[in-house]
Amino acid sequence: MSASVELSSYRDQHFKGSRSEQERSLRGSCTLYVGNLSFYTTEEQIHELFSRCGDVRVIVMGLDKYKKTPCGFCFVEYYVRAEAEAAMRFVNGTRLDDRLIRVDWDAGFIEGRQYGRGKTGGQVRDEYRTDYDAGRGGYGKLLSQKIAPNTDNR
């Protein structure tokens, strides 16, 4: 494996199995995790970009677990490992919807993983963000709840 397709240090804490089983799955996987997407990026845009590296088997958009709206990540699965490696090499760090996207190996999509794991339904990283990011819903979710006016007592 060349340097650009090596495994990162990230490991899914919810993986069902040992650390060595997870690493074995990652080394043979044809599935990629794609992060730092705009909430407005479409499946079609992702397909257009990733299909430049090979035949995409499936794209699974990450969704807010309560609202069922896009929340800034997806999984892209190829039919063959070499094409996934090409995407790791050439797509990781490129711009999509004016955002630098991150691509990492994934052990393989399992139903339920398409939902954000944060308390408010989206990704954990978007809950604690203190900066304004229009492509990811504005301010962080927890900060937005603190500064939003309470409309229950009117």
From Swiss-Prot:
GO terms for molecular function: RNA cap binding. Keywords: mRNA processing, mRNA splicing, Nucleus, RNA-binding, RNA-mediated gene silencing. MRNA binds at Y10, Y33, R102, V103, D104, W105, D106, R113, Q114, Y115, G116, R117, Q123, V124. GO terms for biological process: mRNA cis splicing, via spliceosome; negative regulation of viral genome replication; primary miRNA processing; regulatory ncRNA-mediated post-transcriptional gene silencing; siRNA processing. InterPro entries: NCBP2, NCBP2_RRM, Nucleotide-bd_a/b_plait_sf, RBD_domain_sf, RRM_dom. SUPFAM superfamilies: RNA-binding domain, RBD. Component of the nuclear cap-binding complex (CBC), a heterodimer composed of Cbp80 and Cbp20 that interacts with m7GpppG-capped RNA. Interacts with Ars2. This is Nuclear cap-binding protein subunit 2. It comes from Drosophila erecta (Fruit fly).
